[in-house]
Design a protein with these regions (language model features):
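Conserved N-terminal beta-strand and adjoining loop/helix that marks the start
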Residues: 1-20, 88
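Active-site-adjacent beta-strand/loop module that shapes the phosphate/pyrophosphate-binding cleft
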Residues: 73-99
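Conserved hydrophobic/aromatic beta-strand scaffold that supports enzyme active sites
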Residues: 22, 68, 86-88, 115
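NUDIX/MutT-family hydrolases
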Residues: 88, 99-135
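Conserved Nudix-box catalytic region and its N-terminal flanking loop in Nudix hydrolases
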Residues: 16-54
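A short coil-to-beta-strand element that immediately follows conserved catalytic motifs
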Residues: 59-68
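Short connector loops at helix/strand junctions that flank enzyme active sites
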Residues: 7, 15, 33, 60, ...
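Short loop segments at secondary-structure junctions
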Residues: 17-19, 90-95, 118-120
Length: 140
């Protein structure tokens, strides 16, 4: 039997001009906060900064830990369990992207990023939905 494990993920809330940065798989109808898996030996903040650099080429700063969201779901017929560490996030590379004004370019072919108005977060199908409160103010 394949050993199962709980995935630990660092996610960032970047809010600018009333918009929150979200990530979307190109072949799906949902969104999630940017970030990714924490690798052994790194902190959540380090993982968030690394993932943003890998996925967008942009330098980010991970700030205050805003909260923790647990999630359990089935994807492609397989049960997944994850713990999401949610941090404040700022994008440092303002010369490359006007924060909040235009789409952040993805370096990965299967995802895209977009700035979504905080008051439209309910229509963004954010998963897990327990993350929605952080997208309005950065705080739960």
């Amino acid at each position: 039997m394949e050993e199962k494990h709980i995935e630990t993920i660092a996610r960032g809330v970047c809010i600018s001009d009333g918009k929150v940065l979200l990530c979307m798989p190109k072949d799906r109808s949902y969104s999630y906060l940017p970030g990714g898996h924490i690798e052994f030996g790194e902190t959540g903040r380090e993982a968030l900064v690394r993932e943003m650099k890998e996925e967008t080429g942009l330098d980010a700063t991970a700030g205050e830990l805003l909260g923790v969201v647990e999630s359990s779901f089935v994807q492609k017929g397989e049960r997944h369990c994850e713990i999401n560490l949610i941090y404040e996030m700022k994008i440092e590379s303002k010369s490359e992207v006007e924060v909040g004004q235009r789409t952040v370019q993805s370096l990965e072919s299967w995802i895209c990023f977009d700035w979504v108005p905080c008051d439209k977060i309910d229509s963004a199908n954010l998963l897990p939905p327990e993350m929605k409160p952080y997208c309005h103010t950065g705080k739960n």
